[in-house]
């Protein structure tokens, strides 16, 4: 098989679009929870609702835009224009402030309730643009730009970006007091403008995919293409991988929406960035090389060590609260998380039917975002239902996350091994 020749522009586009896109997602997935918790006194249920609504928006968007980009045979315009609009939508969060809400809704009984509702609504709007650009079209473009000879290497770089994005965000957030509203205004403007600039740069960096538009002419049929029983039967490895990936994502989403709050509120680690940074750097380096394990040894020998690392990380985080063990547990958990994403992501790309990458991005999002985004945070919220509470300076009551989120994540992760069994059997028969 002839190896895909990737230009320098491809690697530059891969790194910066993946990194900046992940920075935006990190702020949404890890800090929007902090934003509505600190600024609006949101409950665990409200946080779970926000994550679930965003997951639904991401899935529907990816299904619609993925099929549309296949029909038109275009990726570049959706990526670039999508990033520009994505950036503007991020900037709009700078306007969700108490003074603005009081001016627009003077009769509202609770400005906090209005604030939480606006954040959830605008999160869905932002997710529409972000999923159009990143989930649907950037991922489809990436699938088409690589092949089985370098898939693991490309996916390794792509999969380590969430960790690097966390490092960038954590480092950047050190200069802000997250208890002050003006800090959040600056954060949303800085990130939003950066995403807009990148979208403009994409017109000069991204080379259009070679997908043929005339081969995918039936738009509405394409939207539901991946859900047809005949397609599922014809691609058993792909769908078994999606099911296992969904279980993996559920385990992650049980604790992830509450992770920063757990470290800052429960453990009182105001210097959590200094603890996270070394763990993130080491995990990012580990992930960059781990993609080659998939290339050389295959899925089975790559996914099992990743899951074991994840489970050990959960155990350490559940039993220990002091700085050193928390660092070790975080490192192991992050290594397992990102390595697992690398392996599952590469597997999905390798078994995506040729010239139908866009139509299958919706199915990827169902397994990677929708199912985990609805079930995971709901389990986390149920676990925290009777958690201790504190009363803030403004009189609002807030919950205190506890270590049981890691126990629940561990139990959920055990089911991944059960779901991998039929997948391994299918792979042995190939």
Regions found by a protein language model. Give the residues of each.
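Helix-loop boundary and gating motifs at the non-cytosolic
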Residues: 2-55, 237-267, 273
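Helix-to-loop junctions at the C-terminal end of transmembrane segments
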Residues: 60-74, 286-299, 384
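A membrane-interface helix-boundary motif in multi-pass transporters
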Residues: 75, 176-193, 384-412
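Juxtamembrane intracellular "pre-TM" segments in multi-pass secondary transporters
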Residues: 1-8, 209-243
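Structural signature of the two symmetry-related core transmembrane helices
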Residues: 77-92, 301-316
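Glycine-rich segments within core transmembrane alpha-helices of 12-TM secondary carriers
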Residues: 58-59, 152-174, 365-377
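Multi-pass alpha-helical transporter architecture, strongest
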Residues: 93-100, 196-206, 402-430
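Hydrophobic core of transmembrane alpha-helices in multi-pass small-molecule transporters
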Residues: 19, 89, 96, 103-133, ...
């Amino acid at each position: 098989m002839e190896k895909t020749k990737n230009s320098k522009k491809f690697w530059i586009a891969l790194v910066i679009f993946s990194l900046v896109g992940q920075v935006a997602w990190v702020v949404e997935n890890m800090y929007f929870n902090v934003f509505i918790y600190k600024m609006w006194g949101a409950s665990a249920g409200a946080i779970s609702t926000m994550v679930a609504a965003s997951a639904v928006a991401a899935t529907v968007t990816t299904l619609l835009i993925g099929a549309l980009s296949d029909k038109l045979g275009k990726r570049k315009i959706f990526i670039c224009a999508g990033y520009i609009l994505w950036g503007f939508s991020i900037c709009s969060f700078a306007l969700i402030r108490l003074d603005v809400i009081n001016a627009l809704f003077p009769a509202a009984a609770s400005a906090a309730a209005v604030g939480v509702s606006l954040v959830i609504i605008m999160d869905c709007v932002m997710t529409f643009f972000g999923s159009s650009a990143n989930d649907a079209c950037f991922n489809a473009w990436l699938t088409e730009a690589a092949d089985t000879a370098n898939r693991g290497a490309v996916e390794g770089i792509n999969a380590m970006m969430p960790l690097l994005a966390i490092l960038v965000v954590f480092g950047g957030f050190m200069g802000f007091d997250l208890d002050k509203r003006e800090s959040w205004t600056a954060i949303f403007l800085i990130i939003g403008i950066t995403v807009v600039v990148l979208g403009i740069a994409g017109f000069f960096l991204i080379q259009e995919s070679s997908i043929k538009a005339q081969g995918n002419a039936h738009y509405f049929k394409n939207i539901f293409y991946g859900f047809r029983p005949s397609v599922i039967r014809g691609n058993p490895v792909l769908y078994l991988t999606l099911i296992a990936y969904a279980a993996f994502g559920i385990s992650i989403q049980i604790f992830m929406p509450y992770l920063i709050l757990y470290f800052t509120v429960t453990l009182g680690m105001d210097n959590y960035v200094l603890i996270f940074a070394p763990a993130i750097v080491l995990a990012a380096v580990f992930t960059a090389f781990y993609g080659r394990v998939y290339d050389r040894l295959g899925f089975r020998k790559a996914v099992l060590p990743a899951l074991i690392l994840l489970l050990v990380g959960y155990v350490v985080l559940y039993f220990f609260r002091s700085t050193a063990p928390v660092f070790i547990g975080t490192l192991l958990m992050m290594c397992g998380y990102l390595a697992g994403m690398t392996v599952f992501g590469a597997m999905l790309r390798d078994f995506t039917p040729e010239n139908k990458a866009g139509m299958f991005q919706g199915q990827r999002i169902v397994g990677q975002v929708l199912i985990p985004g609805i079930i995971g945070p709901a389990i986390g919220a149920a676990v925290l239902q009777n958690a201790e509470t504190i009363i803030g300076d403004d009189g609002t009551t807030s919950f205190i996350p506890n270590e049981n989120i890691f126990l629940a994540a561990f139990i959920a992760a055990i089911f991944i091994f059960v779901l991998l069994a039929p997948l391994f059997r299918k792979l042995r028969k190939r």
